[in-house]
Amino acid sequence: FEDNFFSHQNCASESVKIMKKQNIEGCLLFNISKQSVNPGKNFGPYGLPKSALLNLCKQYAVDYGALGIRSNGVNADRIRSGLLNNAMITSRAKAREVSTDEYMRGNLLLNEVKAEDVANAFFHLAVSKKTTGAILTVDGGNIAASLR
């Protein structure tokens, strides 16, 4: 919970204090995860705080929207990172009896989702002045993890 919930809460809380003190509007952005709506086996310690984080994002929208402080999140899946490294990709692909390439393209669009795609989603939410409480999914299409 410390890394995947409280770090977000601490940053968001301090950011809101600054925005209120300076009487400015702004946007809080939360790095959520597919795990928040579609937990994977043996990923409880990662997924539980991410589920709480999704609700925290929405709570900030409710609590501070009237002050012009927006709160949005990105819900991404299968992005190469320090957590989803080559060893984990190989292990998860082997468990599913697919190649690593097939594992990374295992979505409706059949395309690997890259860090750049996630960065673009964060940028879009940051500049969308009329959007708050939104969770933008960036996963190439994973119906099991869909918010709808």
List the predicted regions and their residue ranges.
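Catalytic Tyr-X3-Lys loop
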Residues: 1-10, 29, 53, 104, ...
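Active-site helix of classical SDR
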Residues: 12, 49, 57
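Short, small/polar-rich loop/turn modules that mediate ligand/substrate recognition or access, typified
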Residues: 65, 70, 130-134
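A glycine/serine/threonine-rich, flexible loop-to-helix segment
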Residues: 66, 79-107, 148
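C-terminal substrate-recognition "lid" of short-chain dehydrogenase/reductases
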Residues: 111-138, 143
